[in-house]
Each structure stands twice: as C-alpha cells, then as structure tokens.
UniProtKB/Swiss-Prot annotation:
Pathway: Bacterial outer membrane biogenesis; LPS lipid A biosynthesis. Belongs to the transferase hexapeptide repeat family. LpxD subfamily. It is an enzyme of class 2 (transferase). Homotrimer. Gene3D superfamilies: Hexapeptide repeat proteins, MurE/MurF, N-terminal domain. It comes from Methylobacterium radiotolerans (strain ATCC 27329 / DSM 1819 / JCM 2831 / NBRC 15690 / NCIMB 10815 / 0-1). GO terms for molecular function: N-acyltransferase activity. Keywords: Acyltransferase, Lipid A biosynthesis, Lipid biosynthesis, Lipid metabolism, Repeat, Transferase. GO terms for biological process: lipid A biosynthetic process. The active site is at 257 (proton acceptor). It catalyses: a UDP-3-O-[(3R)-3-hydroxyacyl]-alpha-D-glucosamine + a (3R)-hydroxyacyl-[ACP] = a UDP-2-N,3-O-bis[(3R)-3-hydroxyacyl]-alpha-D-glucosamine + holo-[ACP] + H(+). This is UDP-3-O-acylglucosamine N-acyltransferase. It holds the Pfam family LpxD. Its EC number is 2.3.1.191.
Amino acid sequence: MSDPVFFTAAATGLTLAEIAAAAGTGLPEGADPDRRFSGAASLESAGPDHLAYMDNARYGDALAATRAGACLVSPRFAARCPAGTVALVSRDPYRAYAALLGRLHPDALRPGSQFAVRGVAPGAHVHPEARLEDGVTVDPGAVIGPGAEIGAGTVVGPNAVIGPGVRIGRDCAIGAGTTLSHALLGNRVIVHPGARLGQDGFGFAMGATHLKVPQVGRVIVQDDVEIGANTTVDRGASRDTVIGEGTKIDNLVQIAHNVVIGRHCVIVSGVGISGSTTLEDYVVLGGQVGVVGHLRIGRGSQIAGSSNVNRDVPPGSRWGGTPAKPVRAWFRELTTLARLAERSGKDQAGDDA
C-alpha cells in the first residue's frame, strides 16, 4: 500500500468504469461503474477502495482472502476472487496494473524535486554559460557546468554534477548525487541516484609500466532509457558508448568503454559488460551476468543470471552457465554431473562398508 507521506494519490482517484476502460477489460454484471478507488495495494493489504492484481498461482490463497475492491486477474484465476472483489479479467494483469498505478500515483512514475523546488533553488550553482530551457528544476547543491544544455521539464536532483558541454533532453530526471560528463542524453531519460556517466574508461597500454590511454569518446543515451542507482557507464575510448532507446538498466551495473547497447534491452543488477561489446535490440541479461569484451549478443537473446559470456551469441538464443552455452546443453551438463556425483557417492559408500 502506498504511503501518502511519500506518494500523492490522484486527486479524485478513478472510478471502476475508468479502471476497466484503461485496462481494456469488461465489467462483470452487477458491478457499480461509479464505484471510486483511491489507490492500489497488494492482495494482503488492500481494502475496499483499493485495486490489486494477481497472476501467480502461489498467491491463490491471498486472492481468496483479499479485501480489495477490485482485482486485475488472468482468466484462470477469475473464479477465485471473493464475493466482495470485482474481478477484472485481463490477458496481462501485471501490465494493466502498472498502467493504472501510473494514473493513481502519477508522481511515482518519474522522480521530481526533493525540495518542492520550481526553477533553480538557492544553493545550486549554474554556470552563466549553461543553457536551461524554461521549466527546468535544479535542486540545492547541484552544479551545472559551462556550455551544458538542459531541456524543459527536466529535474536535476540535489548534489548532482552536470559537466561542461553535457546535453540533457526534455522531461528527464537526474537523481541526487549523480555525475554526468562527456554525455548526450535524449528525452525522458531517468538516471537514478549515485549513477556515473561519462567518466574515463579503463584503458591502459600494458607493459613494465602501464600507460594510460586517453578516452576521447562520449556516452550517448537515447530516449526513454532508465539507468539504475550506482550504475557506471564509461565514455568511449575512440568511439562512443551508446545506450539505445527504451533500454532499462538496473542498479549496480558496469558498462565499459565503447559498449553499444541496442533498443529496449533489459540489464539486471550486478551485470558487467566489458569494452567494445555490442548488444543488439531486445537482449536480456540476468543478474550478475559477465560479458567479456569485443563480442556481439544477437537480437532478442536472453542470458541466464550469473552466467559468463565469452563468445558471440546468435540472435534469438537462450544461453546460461559458465562459460555460457545454449540452455539445453547447459541443463544436460548439470544433469550429467549430478548423476555422476550421486553414483560416485554410492560407490564410495559401498567401499566404506
């Protein structure tokens, strides 16, 4: 359940008819279309004026016991809704719920000013040569360097540092304590607190002494990208590091110099991508995946969590393991090893007898 201290509900909430229309569902016979809902909550904590959702058999008991006024459910669970809960049947309840949450709690979609600031707050430092469109918000302690450009509707959080010449598009959110240098950001980009974009890539000419290789590329972040807290994106060495449109990156991810990430990729926390690797569109990397440098992971491929990728991955593949391989081969190896270990244990027990 949302805490009103942190999340402001839409002023009038939504009627059941509005919820059904937004979710693309019909209303069951006898349901009151004018019934009003003030917010959304989990099955366990929802009350009569809350919307919930359910699409996992593990929560069947919670659905049967919920007090939610309405619940978005897939067809197979609709009959399990209790009498006091309106079942809104959807083929994708979670996606419908996400869209409705954005309407019930619009301020949760994108971070806003932490100080209810409009314009540039006292205590922020904006260089005279920086260019800010009307409607930019800058929280206390933020620093914006010479030649930086920031588009209308963007919020720069407290103690963020926007380096010289950095360009940020419109309706972006730059979190507290972030640093951006040598970077160009598109529109509607969200950068969460503590992220670092545009610092030196890790490049050295190795020898008796290690000679630093100047990193003279940039970071390019296209529209609708989200970058998690404490993620680091190094600028390119001699070409740009690129993050494609619509890609979502979790917390604590390391993206090295010259990496090119396609459109609508998903990268889960703990991932490390070494230099000059390319991810084509719609690639998914599970948590703690490691990818060595100078590889290509094909469009639509999925890599299981904690895997290590050390060779190119064809488009549309599902790989896992260390080193990563097609999941069928990986599972076959795991099963074979388990059987061998079991057999060895039995043989050892027989010898001991």
